[in-house]
Amino acid sequence: MDWMRLIRDLCFNPRHTKWMAPLLVLGDAFLCALIIWKVPCKATAKLRSHPFATRERDYTLIRGSTGPLVYPAAHVYSYTALYHLTDEGRDIFFGQILFAVLYLITLVVVLCCYRQSGAPPYLLPLLVLSKRLHSVYVLRLFNDGLAALAMWVAILLFMNRKWTAAVAVWSTGVAIKMTLLLLAPAIAVVTVLSLSLGPSVGLGVLAVLVQVLLAIPFLQNNPAGYLSRAFELTRQFMFKWTVNWRFVGEEVFLSKSFSLALLAVHIVLLGAFAVTGWLRYSRSSLPAFIRNLLAGRHRTVSLPKPYIMSVMLSSLTVGLLCARSLHYQFFAYLSWATPFLLWRAGFHPILLYLIWAMQEWAWNTFPSTNLSSIIVVLSLATQSFGVLANSASAFYTMRSNPSGKEHNQ
């Protein structure tokens, strides 16, 4: 039965990722080219009506193809560049090629993260098989593709302890789309455990400075207008576009009590992850950890790469689970995280593939239905609670080493 041992080794031995990953990238490049060739692009208006083409600096007066601009400054710069690179939005084909390259670069970064975390090769095919993910990138040209690249580059940098670069890249991603704020709790935990309180606060200041520097042209003109539009936290979402909460009905979806309930669940889940998983490397109870941290007695820890990736992606998925409304483009953040989280949750490979397929079906159902939205929420809950229930393995399979202070890089 040597062939059985060979198949098992190919599926479970992480050393095979080194040669499998380039083959998957090559195959996916061919698939992207085929999609661009055969499927009409759906993002012509997005390229042809870019708001910054008029050089307007008052954020309250800038409009895009779908109405008032509601994204931060880096989004404006990114799509201004795209607007000019595509001959003022007329060369849609070249725009698709650019987003296909963006997709493939992000895939390479994701594969690097998977390899460094020791993930088994049987997860890798799931990283290139998503119909919805290809649509988000090469057919819809959403800014979420740019933000997702920033997210994964930041995760890779955090895994390799490049703290300053990681925070700068992450904050730039936040300036493309606020979804990346969902990583903030994880970043706080990882940096505090690795560097202690003072350096972590310094990195937080750096993140704010990146936002200020990117927004200077708009802050000089109308700072209140920029902050209210770019970082609007009270935005009312339209029920007809929701992917996740359609099954609760429009009245509940639009109610303030539902929004507050989701916020409360989000806070409780973050606390549960912190107590049962994220902070256990501190080797003390939560009250003792806080006391030691404030008193300057916290002993820094060299965190293993699988732990860092698990903390980052679990923070992301908890945030998506408790989001007021998810739209189809949000799959850019979730799709590549799901296989890893299901693996860390300890699911059998067959069950893992089944959950992935159900999630993929739900996100490809347009418009969303009660059933598809239930599956979206259940799949997110399965990933979040699965990792939480399996926290002993999900966060502690690798030993950490006490160390002195780690320097910013």
UniProtKB/Swiss-Prot annotation:
InterPro entries documented for this protein: Glycosyltransferase_ALG3
Protein EC: 2.4.1.258
Disulfide bridge positions per record: none
Enzyme category, top tier: transferase
GO cellular component term of the entry, any: endoplasmic reticulum membrane
GO biological process, one term: protein N-linked glycosylation
Catalyzed reactions per annotation: an alpha-D-Man-(1->2)-alpha-D-Man-(1->2)-alpha-D-Man-(1->3)-[alpha-D-Man-(1->6)]-beta-D-Man-(1->4)-beta-D-GlcNAc-(1->4)-alpha-D-GlcNAc-diphospho-di-trans,poly-cis-dolichol + a di-trans,poly-cis-dolichyl beta-D-mannosyl phosphate = an alpha-D-Man-(1->2)-alpha-D-Man-(1->2)-alpha-D-Man-(1->3)-[alpha-D-Man-(1->3)-alpha-D-Man-(1->6)]-beta-D-Man-(1->4)-beta-D-GlcNAc-(1->4)-alpha-D-GlcNAc-diphospho-di-trans,poly-cis-dolichol + a di-trans,poly-cis-dolichyl phosphate + H(+)
The family this protein is said to belong to: Belongs to the glycosyltransferase ALG3 family.
Annotated function: Dol-P-Man:Man(5)GlcNAc(2)-PP-Dol alpha-1,3-mannosyltransferase that operates in the biosynthetic pathway of dolichol-linked oligosaccharides, the glycan precursors employed in protein asparagine (N)-glycosylation. The assembly of dolichol-linked oligosaccharides begins on the cytosolic side of the endoplasmic reticulum membrane and finishes in its lumen. The sequential addition of sugars to dolichol pyrophosphate produces dolichol-linked oligosaccharides containing fourteen sugars, including two GlcNAcs, nine mannoses and three glucoses.
Protein name according to UniProt: Dol-P-Man:Man(5)GlcNAc(2)-PP-Dol alpha-1,3-mannosyltransferase
Gene designation per UniProt: alg3
